[in-house]
């Protein structure tokens, strides 16, 4: 399961389900001296190599965190999300968004990315979500509660499947 770094519990759940995490974040994310404005971006070259090696059918989804906690809260650019969506549409791969800190990521886009300075954070959040097939959100972070979260899916069948599992795991 390719992703822009990982969050510990997300990676654990992926591995418990039989997946294997593969980091496809840009190299600048690992360089504290780099001044790259969007160190959370997916390296599409690394992703392309992974798809060629394993085949798109063996990649259930790409996990994109906004912002990337393990990289010190680094944001993902809208341009990168658009390119990722184009890539995944071509290969039939889903994009799942960890949107726990999406408001901060949207603010960084507003402040740093050309064409977004006059856009509201809310409209940027909506655009980000439009490039994905589903999202997870942890209420334990910015929502200021000690428990909870949600899963949103564009696929009704996957939604029904997940709803049935909630009964077992809630």
Task: Give, region by region, the residue ranges found by the protein language model.
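Conserved PLP-enzyme active-site core in the AAT-like
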Residues: 1-170
């Amino acid at each position: 399961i390719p992703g822009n770094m990982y969050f510990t519990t997300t990676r654990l759940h992926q591995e418990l389900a039989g997946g294997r995490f593969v980091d496809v974040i840009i190299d600048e994310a690992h360089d504290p001296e780099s001044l790259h404005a969007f160190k959370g971006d997916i390296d599409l070259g690394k992703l392309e190599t992974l798809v060629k090696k394993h085949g798109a059918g063996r990649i259930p989804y790409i996990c994109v965190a906004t912002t990337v906690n393990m990289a010190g809260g680094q944001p993902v650019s809208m341009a990168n999300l658009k390119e990722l969506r184009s890539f995944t549409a071509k290969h039939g791969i889903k994009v799942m968004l960890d949107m726990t800190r999406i408001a901060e990521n949207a603010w960084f886009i507003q402040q740093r990315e050309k064409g977004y300075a006059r856009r509201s954070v809310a409209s940027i959040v909506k655009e980000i979500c439009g490039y994905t097939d589903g999202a997870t959100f942890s209420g334990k972070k910015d929502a200021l509660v000690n428990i909870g979260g949600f899963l949103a899916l564009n696929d009704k069948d996957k939604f029904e499947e997940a709803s049935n599992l909630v009964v077992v795991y809630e």
